[in-house]
């Protein structure tokens, strides 16, 4: 490679969007290999990687080894590298992890892209011999990235927001179920006390309380609203306090805050899901440099 990868003045997509969003576009190529690079972008970075891998292949070829053939399957979900006959997936490069893609104008067969490895988080440069269709493959990867980015912004953000609301409502429901169980236990305790209370009736129909220090249930009156000092009745029983109007508005009849689905807080994502969303957002935000042209659309929506 005697000079830099040339820069395209514009982008002309090669395929119908449905071919990449609902299916994939296959290409056959020879896989020269992959090597670690220090930077996620740069013509000089990929030029050095191509030289290194070409030299390594020349040595292996002199030893009688053939360059392995692979099948590339490009879609909005990534670039898969498969063994042509068995269809075994050798590498699966997600688009938001691909930061640079280029084809060599001095050699129509060679194209390369840089992808961040999902396990090591190192930047790897993949190099292919594509039988004179390097430019088409480069454009196809660029188109797939463009479509995937749009899909992430248009539908991904809404889906994320919906899942947040559902998670918040599920958490609120769990809290309400816990409160409800506690209230049921309190009611059961009241019923048990009622059964053991000794109540005597007079001929006039009045009720005589066996203990002047308790109410008709032989216990201190229960109030789910508040616990101010009780008021004494004429017969010495302790009467429950009357709740204020403001408390009645803020609490339901069980003393719990009324459930409002519009005001419930958004729940947190599990760490693995949240980290995946953050990773995708960061990858798409970086954009894909395609032969020096950055395919980075509008700024990321704050909802994502």
From Swiss-Prot:
Q: Which InterPro entries match?
A: Adapter_Engulfment-Domain, PH-like_dom_sf, PTB/PI_dom
Q: Where located?
A: Cytoplasm
One Pfam family assigned to this protein is PID
Give residues where Phosphoserine occurs: 223
Do you know which SMART domains this protein is assigned to? PTB
UniProt GO cellular component terms: cytoplasm
Ranges for domain PID come to 21-176
Give the record's keywords alphabetically: Apoptosis, Coiled coil, Cytoplasm, Lipid transport, Phagocytosis, Phosphoprotein, Transport
Q: Which PANTHER family match?
A: PHOSPHOTYROSINE INTERACTION DOMAIN-CONTAINING FAMILY MEMBER, PTB DOMAIN-CONTAINING ENGULFMENT ADAPTER PROTEIN 1
On subunit structure and binding partners, the annotation says: Homodimer. Interacts with GDP-bound ARF6, but not with GTP-bound ARF6. Part of a complex composed of GULP1, ACAP1 and ARF6. Interacts with ACAP1, LRP1, MEGF10 and STAB2. Interacts with clathrin.
Q: Which named protein is this?
A: PTB domain-containing engulfment adapter protein 1
Q: Lineage of the native species?
A: Eukaryota, Metazoa, Chordata, Craniata, Vertebrata
């Amino acid at each position: 490679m005697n000079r830099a990868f040339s820069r395209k003045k514009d982008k002309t997509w090669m395929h119908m969007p449905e071919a990449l969003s609902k299916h994939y576009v296959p290409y056959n190529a020879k896989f020269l290999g992959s090597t670690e690079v220090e930077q996620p972008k740069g013509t000089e970075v990929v030029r050095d990687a191509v030289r290194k891998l070409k030299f390594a292949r020349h040595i292996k070829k002199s030893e009688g080894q053939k360059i392995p053939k692979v099948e590339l399957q490009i879609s909005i979900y990534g670039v898969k590298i498969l063994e042509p006959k068995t269809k075994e997936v050798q590498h699966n490069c997600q688009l938001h992890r691909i930061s640079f893609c280029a084809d060599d104008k001095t050699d129509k067969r060679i194209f390369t892209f840089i992808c961040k490895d999902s396990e090591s988080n190192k930047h790897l440069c993949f190099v292919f011999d594509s039988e004179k269709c390097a430019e088409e493959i480069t454009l196809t990867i660029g188109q797939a990235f463009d479509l995937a980015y749009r899909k992430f912004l248009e539908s991904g953000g809404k889906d994320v927001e919906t899942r947040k609301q559902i998670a918040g409502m599920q958490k609120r429901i769990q809290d309400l179920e816990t409160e409800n169980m506690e209230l049921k236990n309190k009611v059961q305790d009241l019923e048990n006390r009622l059964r053991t209370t000794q109540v005597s009736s007079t001929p006039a129909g009045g009720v005589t309380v066996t203990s002047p220090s308790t109410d008709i249930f032989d216990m201190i009156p229960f109030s789910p609203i508040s616990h101010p000092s009780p008021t004494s009745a004429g017969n010495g029983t302790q009467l429950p306090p009357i709740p204020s109007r403001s408390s009645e508005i803020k609490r339901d009849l069980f003393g719990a805050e009324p459930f409002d689905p519009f005001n419930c807080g958004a729940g947190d994502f599990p760490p693995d899901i949240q980290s995946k969303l953050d990773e995708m957002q960061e990858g798409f935000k970086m954009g894909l440099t395609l032969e020096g042209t950055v395919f980075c659309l509008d700024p990321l929506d704050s909802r994502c």
